[in-house]
Amino acid sequence: MKNVSPSYLKHHFLIAMPHMADPNFAQTLTYIVEHNASGAMGLVVNRPQDLNLADILEQLRPDQEPSLLCQHVPIFSGGPVQTDRGFVLHPNGPVYQATVELEGLSLSTSQDVLFAIADGVGPAKSLIALGYAGWEAGQLEAELADNAWLTCPFDADILFNTSSELRLEAAARHLGVNLSLLTSQAGHA
């Protein structure tokens, strides 16, 4: 008997199908940070909030005026779970107090990365998110089987060099897909 290991989607994008009914994920592009037999974790990367880094720093460093640069660093809604918790995706390089290196990318969760970005000595490219998307064991696999998502290999250019409102379409184009031509009716071959 052949031993087949499961296929996991760590370091991939999930593209929400046009018929996605869940308002937390409709029209989203989600980067998958971790996916294994226990479940999955991801960050929505195309939903900026009405917050910027200056707003966050006012809470973290109330005695220090944030630089004007901080007003132009958006904060994204990373997902509906733990929306008070911050996550920073950035290229590999400096390691902060709480940094996990992924495949050519790092995820930092400590305040020092925010301070470094604010002070102009942090990663040149980053995405700051509050909250994350989480799936229990088997949940994401079931959603994929129900055609709720398309999967796309990660592309740093989409994450760091494409404006947030164009990321979903850019990921779909990476697959050769035009989302406006997709139907909610799908079959299984």
From Swiss-Prot:
Cellular component aspect of the GO annotation: cytosol
The species this protein was found in: Pseudomonas fluorescens (strain ATCC BAA-477 / NRRL B-23932 / Pf-5)
Higher taxonomy: Bacteria, Pseudomonadati, Pseudomonadota, Gammaproteobacteria, Pseudomonadales
Cross-referenced Pfam families: DUF179
Family designation: Belongs to the UPF0301 (AlgH) family.
InterPro entries according to UniProt: AlgH-like
Highest taxon of source: Bacteria
Positions in coiled-coil regions: none
Full protein name: UPF0301 protein PFL_5830
PANTHER family given in the database record: UNCHARACTERIZED PROTEIN YQGE, UPF0301 PROTEIN YQGE
SUPFAM superfamilies: VC0467-like
NCBIfam families attached to this UniProt entry: PRK00228.1-1
